[in-house]
Amino acid sequence: MATDGSDPIPPHKTFDTILVLDFGSQYTHLITRRLRELNVYSEMLPCNTKLADLPFTPKGIILSGGPYSVYEEGAPHVDHAVFDLGVPILGICYGLQEMAWHFGKNAGVAAGEKREYGHANLKVESHGGHMDELFKDVGNELEVWMSHGDKLSNMPENFTTVATTTNAPFAGIAHKEKKYYGIQFHPEVTHTKMGKTVLKNFAVDICQSTTDWTMGKFVDQEITRIRKLVGEKGQVIGAVSGGVDSTVAAKLMKEAIGDRFHAVMVDNGVLRLNEAKQVKETLEKGLGINLTVIDASDMFLDRLKGITDNPEQKRKVIGNTFIEIFQEKAKEIAAAAKNSSNAGEIEWLLQGTLYPDVIESLSFKGPSQTIKTHHNVGGLPANMNLKLIEPLRELFKDEVRALGVELGIPEDLVWRHPFPGPGIAIRILGEVTREQVRIAREADYIFIEEIKAAGLYRNISQAFAALLPVKAVGVMGDKRVHDQVIALRAVETTDFMTADWYPFDGEFLKRVSRRIVNEVNGVCRVVYDITSKPPGTIEME
């Protein structure tokens, strides 16, 4: 919860935890998601995590898939201490091959004669005892999803085959004595029928994990953690944007420490149309949270001048300026509170960081690369005088929404689309100027207004208009113009780790395009982004 390591009771100390070690698969985060859907708490760490550095003992370990070949030089390998921990282990795809590689001797992993991508028919073999537990209640055959080039060519010592496919004679293996299992398919993807049952068998039946990870339980535990961390007189200043993440975080903090929580919104000049006014009304009237709005738009926009092609620099400038303003406001609030019932030091800064933010900001030395610096995770100055408190840091987006409902937050707030901390600045590709902000802001307002009017808002996970760094020729009012291009983006997703573009019908897009071109001065062309994530990210920068 706190990034300085002072959190007295992290979730893995409270809930039984399945540890997922990531070898770089595009599906790894889904393993954690599926386990949490089963009410089993799970955390993901890099595959090269040293067990000696692990602050908890997991109930079980899952080795993820990955884009590597275990036999190649430089391929990532797990800490050998994993196999001395005495807990059940499940290897998925590359994880199976890594397990076989570890046990060595007669085991072999080789490039398959035929790569296997897509659906496959898995046949389950019965051997009795613990070896049958992984495939309990799935039947003798099931449809699974394969995504591999290499495969196991020889069985490791003391293992036996528990499942096969036409192209993978060792599609499922199990240790004869220990609760070690390997599967070549991906149970975490929805294409695998009964995949969640396989994960349940491992986590709940084999690992004996409790199924008590619920938002109702999380609220009680988190409020206790916050109170213990902050203390009886400690105060927290909250970074509030009006999005679902910061709203839920603010409500949780209010429930935990009452008036010792100070909600502050910084108008950075790159908010949505009328955002500051609407957020203030929403939080104060709807949730009983007093909100201080600081208009720092001139400072932010002045500091963003001249940044044309470096989105990371934009994020860092916004992050540095944001913290600078918050530190000054914290001093003012602390001074005003000295002679009140709230007397105490403001030591903490609340942020609505989520688990996908943490995952995307990790820089693994082995299998993974940094995708981008998230505004709630990176880009913060090293000399900041406030410690971060991030009560949502272990949650996925859908869990945050469920938490919001648990806290009694109105549905229209719970289901509000996310809005990034750097705001419209990362939806303007190129230099951020007041004129560019105006154009992007007005286009975005029209797009969202039309989505709501069409009854599509809840069907779409995130939508916005972005301003591209190019101009196009058009004809308006019988005259040639050379004006801006707006790109519309809308996606569907459950956890924001992967996303598909939303398939609007042509009439809807025609209507939005016509309105933007006619109502937003300076725009002559509108395009629709149909890039999924991956390969793209949801935001433009």
Swiss-Prot record:
Q: Binding residues for ATP, per the UniProt record?
A: S241, G242, G243, V244, D245, S246, T247
| An annotated GO BP | GMP biosynthetic process
| Molecular function per GO | ATP binding; GMP synthase (glutamine-hydrolyzing) activity; GMP synthase activity
- EC top class, as a word: ligase
Q: In which pathway does it act?
A: Purine metabolism; GMP biosynthesis; GMP from XMP (L-Gln route): step 1/1
SUPFAM superfamilies on file:
Adenine nucleotide alpha hydrolases-like (SSF52402), Class I glutamine amidotransferase-like (SSF52317), GMP synthetase C-terminal dimerisation domain (SSF54810)
Q: What cofactors does the UniProt entry give for this protein?
A: Mg(2+)
PROSITE patterns membership: GATASE_TYPE_1, GMPS_ATP_PPASE
Annotated Glutamine amidotransferase type-1 domain residues = 17-212
Which residues of this protein are catalytic?
Answer: C93 (nucleophile), H186, E188
What intrachain disulfides are recorded? Answer: none
Name the domain of life: Eukaryota
Keywords recorded for this protein, A-Z = ATP-binding, Cytoplasm, Glutamine amidotransferase, GMP biosynthesis, Ligase, Magnesium, Nucleotide-binding, Purine biosynthesis
The record's section on InterPro entries has:
Class_I_gatase-like (IPR029062), GATASE (IPR017926), GMP_synth_C (IPR001674), GMP_synth_GATase (IPR004739), GMP_synthase (IPR022955), GMPS_ATP_PPase_dom (IPR025777), NAD/GMP_synthase (IPR022310), Rossmann-like_a/b/a_fold (IPR014729)
- Known Pfam families for this protein? GATase (PF00117), GMP_synt_C (PF00958), NAD_synthase (PF02540)
Its localization reads:
Cytoplasm, Cytosol
**EC code:** 6.3.5.2
Where XMP binds, per the record, is at R315, D478, K533, E539
Q: How does it assemble?
A: Homodimer.
Function of the protein = Catalyzes the conversion of xanthine monophosphate (XMP) to GMP in the presence of glutamine and ATP through an adenyl-XMP intermediate.
What is this protein's record name?
GMP synthase [glutamine-hydrolyzing]
Q: Which organism is it from?
A: Phaeosphaeria nodorum (strain SN15 / ATCC MYA-4574 / FGSC 10173) (Glume blotch fungus)
